[in-house]
């Protein structure tokens, strides 16, 4: 036997030993606190106006510097992020499954005040939001006993009840930062008006358990606060201060309520979250950490809104040991061991708007999720935009003669991924 042969044989044995000793499955996973999104590089291009972030309980327009930053962010948008966040959302696009079999639910974001055409503004997107069940965030009271309003700093809203007449939805989320704009009587009256029109509600005193095609789905909704109101509502609005960056946010009540919803028979858990810093293209890693904790507590779908701009989407693998967590992969291990996937839409953007520009503010998405066999089987998205005189929500594809909307449509293709876009 030659020396070369001996060396080759030894090398093969060493490599075989190394492969045999390499960690596999969960043994290959890094410690959670030592990997993305807990570990990341700060945005090197972070503009100063990001210091104009507001948390809902501390609006203070007497602070001139902070107010100036806030207005600058409104005009320019925070478009960059951590390098790892950007890379992550680019890489996850290829792992998002297209809409599949099972129960299909559609979601839209913030239904904000409009100036006219209240009863018919949504006629053009009835087919776009079509699904087995349709959900929206009603970000304004509709109390007939209070004046119509949309002013102040921060603004207080109240819309005509006719706004509810033409809504193509089955469930409205009522808890967000504008829930208390006309007080307890106003939010209670809003709920009555919604129910009177045959829609269901969630987020005011109770969460919703609904049956869709013989499948029980729990819709639990939470808001990160009210707009700096000193009064305390007598209603339960399910407030969780999601925006306290750097703090260990207490999600124990949410976990208890998820468990209780499952005890009631929910086969899927959908969380509707009014959260996130306004006018920012990407979620802060803080919110990505929270979302992973919620998925670990049992969430199958997380639907976010509040930033008034569309943010990226990801699918999380639950109890898939071959899916190692990190940049480009959301993966979670839970004690029940049941393999599944969960969907996270960080922000759907606006559904309606009365601010005529920029295109990011006037454009949101209809998000869709398909559920079957205890799993998320697929996702889809369709962009929608607001037109004026009269106010009308239309498919963005019908607005492509407008260069701003055409540009925004292309940006969303890149931001979300075109492969799972729906017409």
Question: Model-predicted segments: where are they?
Answer:
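A short C-terminal boundary segment appended to hydrolase-like catalytic domains
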Residues: 25-102, 261, 334-336, 356-423
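Conserved beta-sheet core of the metallophosphoesterase superfamily
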Residues: 169-171, 283-365
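Binuclear metal-dependent hydrolase catalytic cores centered on His/Asp/Glu-rich metal-binding motifs
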Residues: 119-122, 213-269, 399-402
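Active-site-proximal segments of metal-dependent phosphoesterases and phosphodiesterases across multiple
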Residues: 145-166, 267-300
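Active-site environment of divalent metal-dependent phosphoester hydrolases
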Residues: 114-116, 142-145, 177-191, 203-204, ...
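N-terminal catalytic scaffold of extracellular/periplasmic and nuclease hydrolases
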Residues: 26-175, 181-183, 190
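Short acidic, glycine-rich surface-loop motifs adjacent to enzyme active sites
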Residues: 133-144, 176, 257-282
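Active-site neighborhood of phospho(di)ester-bond hydrolases with catalytic His/Asp-centered motifs
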Residues: 107-110, 133-139, 167-177, 200-205, ...
């Amino acid at each position: 036997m030659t020396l070369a042969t001996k060396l080759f044989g030894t090398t093969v044995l060493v490599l075989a030993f190394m492969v045999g000793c390499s960690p596999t499955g969960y043994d290959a996973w890094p410690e959670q606190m030592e990997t993305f999104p807990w570990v990341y590089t700060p945005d090197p291009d972070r503009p100063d106006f990001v210091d104009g972030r507001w948390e809902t309980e501390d609006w203070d327009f007497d602070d001139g510097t902070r107010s100036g930053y806030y207005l600058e962010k409104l005009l320019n948008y925070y478009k960059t992020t951590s390098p790892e966040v950007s890379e992550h959302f680019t890489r996850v696009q290829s792992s998002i499954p297209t809409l599949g079999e099972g129960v299909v639910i559609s979601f839209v974001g913030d239904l904000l005040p409009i100036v006219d055409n209240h009863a018919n503004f949504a006629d053009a997107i009835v087919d776009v939001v079509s699904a087995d069940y349709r959900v929206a965030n009603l970000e304004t009271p509709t109390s007939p006993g209070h004046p119509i309003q949309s002013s102040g700093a921060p603004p207080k809203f109240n819309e005509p009840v006719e706004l509810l007449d033409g809504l193509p939805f089955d469930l409205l989320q009522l808890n967000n930062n504008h829930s208390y704009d006309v007080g307890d009587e106003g939010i209670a009256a809003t709920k009555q008006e919604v129910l009177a029109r045959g829609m269901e509600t969630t987020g005011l005193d109770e969460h919703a358990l609904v049956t869709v095609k013989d499948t029980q789905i729990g819709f639990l909704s939470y808001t990160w606060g009210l707009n700096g109101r000193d009064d305390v509502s007598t209603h339960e609005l399910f407030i969780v201060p999601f925006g306290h960056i750097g703090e260990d946010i207490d999600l124990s009540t949410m976990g208890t309520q998820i468990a209780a919803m499952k005890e009631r028979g929910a086969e899927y858990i959908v969380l509707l979250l009014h959260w996130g810093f306004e006018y920012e293209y990407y979620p802060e890693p803080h919110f990505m950490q929270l979302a992973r904790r919620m998925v670990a507590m049992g969430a199958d779908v997380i639907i976010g809104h509040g930033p008034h701009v569309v943010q990226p989407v990801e699918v999380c693998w639950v109890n898939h040991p071959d899916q190692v967590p990190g940049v480009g992969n959301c993966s979670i291990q839970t004690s029940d061991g049941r393999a599944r996937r969960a969907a996270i839409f960080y922000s759907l953007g606006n559904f309606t708007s009365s601010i005529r520009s920029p295109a990011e503010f006037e454009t949101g998405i209809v998000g869709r999720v398909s559920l079957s066999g205890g799993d998320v089987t697929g996702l889809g998205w369709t962009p929608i935009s607001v037109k004026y005189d009269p106010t009308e929500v239309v498919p963005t594809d019908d607005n492509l003669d407008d260069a701003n909307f055409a540009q925004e449509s292309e940006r969303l293709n890149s931001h979300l991924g075109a492969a799972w876009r729906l017409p």
